[in-house]
């Protein structure tokens, strides 16, 4: 066999040229113990708090407890495949998620991985899940309405863009329905409104049944609202760290729109379950428990999340992120630990009551206990003009109704007040999936406060409202358009609206 020197030297030169001398350095540790979704790891001396670490098999975790001799890591996934002695690698990255318009129309988990079977998400940007909220200087006070499409809320407890409005109530009182209707109400603006008014929606489901989340997504899809929505799901079967992380992940996705001069709305459904997941993690990490066994920083958990909802000023793009956190109470007890915490953080609350729900008053909003601390600055002028008196009348009605149970002979004025109150309460009822545009709400409430319903039987109010809206949509489009464009009831518009309602009231039998 011939040995060709030239050939050998050519091969050697090629090998030397392609020789890579870069050594891959990664800091690794060892699992000391694992169980209940928590791993104690030895050797990750330089790991950062909140850093993502990787276990064998691609399972991720997050370093939360940095102690002198070990690190407490919460595991995002099943801990069955992790055993003592396994090697744990640092990734060098704080937990982040993909953000951007590519996520619209998708259902993702708390780490931003798609779970809807529609293929990978090609997001161009990633953001940390836990960032500092905007300071005082970049903010502006809330002044634009965030229309929910529900008369009881838009008239009495208005929500503005950049506000945090808590939805609180027992189970099965229609809390999720309020968020769903608010999402559906954005459809007309997305279809033919200007870009600057569009509101992108993020729904975070924490600790709910998968079937419930699937139902929510199905309704959004059927009604064409999924195209401007993102759903982040950490269901009841997901590990506690995922349930803890989901609201932060959803918030980061909403902040992308806020920081790019657009508007976003995020519903956290619900934060009670996030607090329970956080309590579970904290106790397993051996952090000292406080009231109701929650850790001492559970207030900070919710405050740092909700403070990220803000209205930014014009120099910072004038974007906004509105938050609708949900809290589930037990037996209408709003003085428990988590409800009082979140009430004190938010700018108002919508209080839903089981009794009202079973009486058929839906949405079951208790108008007396619900408040919006932003108030009428989050309403258009037309709504302020008509809804100003309805609040007072309903408050008087509630007071009188309590007395009227005892006395049978009531004077005419009291009787009139009770009649009006019963009809206004009926007027504020609304079936699910039928949000109304603001101008339609203004017209209906105008009819209510100006005595058009007083002579009707209570059970005719709903029919009158339907007929009036149908008549306005077909024969008096100019009135509705006028209210939409002017955003106020001018004398001319008021006269036209009055004439339209008069004409309909005459024909209504």
UniProtKB/Swiss-Prot annotation:
Site features described as Required for activity, chain residue numbers: 370
| Record field: catalytic activity | ATP + H2O + 4 H(+)(in) = ADP + phosphate + 5 H(+)(out)
Enzyme class, top EC level, equals: translocase
What Gene3D superfamilies would the database entry show?
Answer: 2.40.30.20, ATP synthase alpha/beta chain, C-terminal domain (1.20.150.20), P-loop containing nucleotide triphosphate hydrolases (3.40.50.300)
Establish whether keyword Transit peptide is in the entry.
no
**GO annotation, cellular component aspect:** plasma membrane; proton-transporting ATP synthase complex
- Any idea which UniProt keywords this protein has? ATP synthesis, ATP-binding, Cell inner membrane, Cell membrane, CF(1), Hydrogen ion transport, Ion transport, Membrane, Nucleotide-binding, Translocase, Transport
EC number(s) given by UniProt = 7.1.2.2
Annotated ATP binding sites: 169-176
Q: Name one GO molecular function term.
A: ATP binding
What PANTHER family does the entry give? Answer: ATP SYNTHASE SUBUNIT ALPHA, MITOCHONDRIAL (PTHR48082:SF2)
Subunit and interaction comment: F-type ATPases have 2 components, CF(1) - the catalytic core - and CF(0) - the membrane proton channel. CF(1) has five subunits: alpha(3), beta(3), gamma(1), delta(1), epsilon(1). CF(0) has three main subunits: a(1), b(2) and c(9-12). The alpha and beta chains form an alternating ring which encloses part of the gamma chain. CF(1) is attached to CF(0) by a central stalk formed by the gamma and epsilon chains, while a peripheral stalk is formed by the delta and b chains.
What this protein is called in its record is ATP synthase subunit alpha
Native organism is Brucella abortus (strain 2308)
